[in-house]
Amino acid sequence: MNQYHDLLERILGEGTEKHDRTGTGTLSVFGHQMRFDLASGFPMLTTKKLPFRSIVHELLWFLRGETNIKYLKDNGVSIWDEWADANGDLGPVYGSQWRSWPARDGRGIDQIANVIDLIQRNPDSRRLIVSAWNPADVDRMALPPCHCLFQFYVAGGKLSCQLYQRSADVFLGVPFNIASYALLTMMVAQVTGLKPGDFVHSLGDAHLYSNHLDQARLQLSRPTRPLPTMTINPEVKDIFAFRYEDFRLENYDPHPHIKAEVAV
């Protein structure tokens, strides 16, 4: 995961101090790209421990089209608690846009089902896109989508994915996002009969919060370890049929967790 460490070093070395919505303050760079070959191991950080269970359940929650945190709470995941209202609702966030984008004629467009169908019918299409950024709904979301658009690409029997992330909390959020979209790429590859290719992560405003700088330096002081491998139940051929038990992370040997506060 040297790609991620390079990003930390770039922000610490050349980042611009900026004010932000949370009032915490950041060091920020604009425009950065990382590429991960999914055949070379599952891109889960080894220089600090990440919560595999939370990453998987959040992705399954997105794919269920849900926007209430009940499913997450029922599965011991608390990463969205700070943004939910008293009823656990978040407004029309990721799951709603992915699975039921509101069309002008009143239909809900299932972008996930549509993109999988298009990959199978026309793998050379340049329209293999899913967007979570809906200007008509942004003001009703508890948190507008940070990872807001992704595109698939098929070549040589392999499926690659590029994510555009407008706002990237590099210490806390980005490691989650890398693992989540790498896993999504592997899942979509399996249900479309392809092999996983690359995950490409393109960042807009990539930042370290001012209260994460010491933690980033600590992480950079740790040597990287071999990447783990991800095994997915090969019997699952429907993207919406996956369960937590269908995923097995093997040979994950990270350094200890590094605590950092979330900026809300």
UniProtKB/Swiss-Prot annotation:
EC annotation from Swiss-Prot or TrEMBL: 2.1.1.45
Location(s), subcellular: Cytoplasm
Entry-linked InterPro entries: Thymidate_synth/dCMP_Mease, Thymidate_synth/dCMP_Mease_dom, Thymidate_synth/dCMP_Mease_sf, Thymidylate_synthase, Thymidylate_synthase_AS
Main localization category: cytoplasm
Binding site for (6R)-5,10-methylene-5,6,7,8-tetrahydrofolate: D169, A263
Family named by the database record: Belongs to the thymidylate synthase family. Bacterial-type ThyA subfamily.
Name of the protein this chain belongs to: Thymidylate synthase
Native species: Nitrobacter winogradskyi (strain ATCC 25391 / DSM 10237 / CIP 104748 / NCIMB 11846 / Nb-255)
Gene behind this protein: thyA
